[in-house]
Amino acid sequence: FENLCRLMSEAETKGKYYKPRIDHDLMEQYNEGIICLSGCASSEISVRLRNGDKKGARKLVDWYAKVFKDRFYLEMQDHGHPDSPTHWDAQNKINLGLQKIAKETGLPLVVTCDGHYLCHADAEAHEILLCIGTGSNLSDPNRMSLKDFQLHVIKPEDIISRWGQDFPEAIRNTKRIAERCEVELELGRILIPKFPVPDGEDEKSYLDKLVFRGLVYRYCGTSLAETEALSVAECR
């Protein structure tokens, strides 16, 4: 869990470009204890399978398997309509590619649901959220939209109906992954990290000092050395 938090922090503070990002070096450095899945249709493995780059996909799979060992799974999804599983041909192409790689390598498959929102009824709210994030209008026919896909958290019985006959082991692997997750988070209290502060200060007094000194330095024409010698009262 600590490694996962480290990766998230690095992605947000150092790797962000529109979205938080991490690279292979970071994953290799902080992989211990983390279970890794090959990702949705936009992952680097899936994109190569979509584009017909089977060698490139296999090379990446081999790298992930080497780094994460028995904690790496090939991830199948299907967000077309339940009555038409191949509604999105690209997803079907990815799944077939993953199934082939699983046979060649012996790596385990797992079925997942790319849940962007909880219930199917939340799809419209999700479209509005996408508009806010991309600065577009609902009326724009060329805007980013995911309305053609079912991205809610699918009920277990629907997953079993879709995958159970052909890939029962891939469904069982979801339970195996859950059983391997050993972190228990304490709920009901604030879990904000403790920020290191100088002797004689608490978090509030130190924040006040930084804020007021920052205001004086930026707007009163004093030097940095002069500003750092001021108390909060003098800054006010």
Can you annotate each of these PLM segments?
Residues 1-236:
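Phosphodiester-processing cores and adjacent nucleic acid-binding clamps
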